[in-house]
Amino acid sequence: MTKSELIEQLCSKKPQLSAKQVEDTVKEVLEQMATTLEGGDRIEIRGFGSFSLHYREPRLGRNPKTGDKVELDGKFVPHFKPGKELRERVNFS
């Protein structure tokens, strides 16, 4: 599902809201989540899951085009861990 598909579905479920209101709300929720993760904080949505940052250690990689070894810096990557309710819904559907 893309962001625009999500907005369309929400508009059809909540016809009293304009498409612009729904779009602005979805964008704001995603922006707040990104800002929270950018600040190094964790996001927990009970029943759905949690978003956090995992650190990837520096490592030696390889350029697939040339085969040369390349040093890769350490970095933080977003990580999602599904909650129990979401795992159960996915496994029983």
UniProtKB/Swiss-Prot annotation:
- According to its record, what are the GO cellular component terms? chromosome; cytosol
Question: Does rRNA processing count among this protein's keywords?
Answer: no
Q: Name one GO biological process term.
A: DNA recombination
Does Transcription regulation count among this protein's keywords?
yes
Matches recorded under InterPro entries: Hist_DNA-bd, Histone-like_DNA-bd_CS, IHF-like_DNA-bd_dom_sf, IHF_beta
Q: Name one GO molecular function term.
A: structural constituent of chromatin
| Keyword vocabulary terms for this entry | DNA recombination, DNA-binding, Transcription, Transcription regulation, Translation regulation
Annotated CDD domains? IHF_B (cd13836)
Listed under subunit, the entry gives: Heterodimer of an alpha and a beta chain.
Tell me the function of this protein.
Answer: This protein is one of the two subunits of integration host factor, a specific DNA-binding protein that functions in genetic recombination as well as in transcriptional and translational control.
The family note in this entry says: Belongs to the bacterial histone-like protein family.
HAMAP family recorded: IHF_beta
Spell out the protein name for this chain.
Integration host factor subunit beta
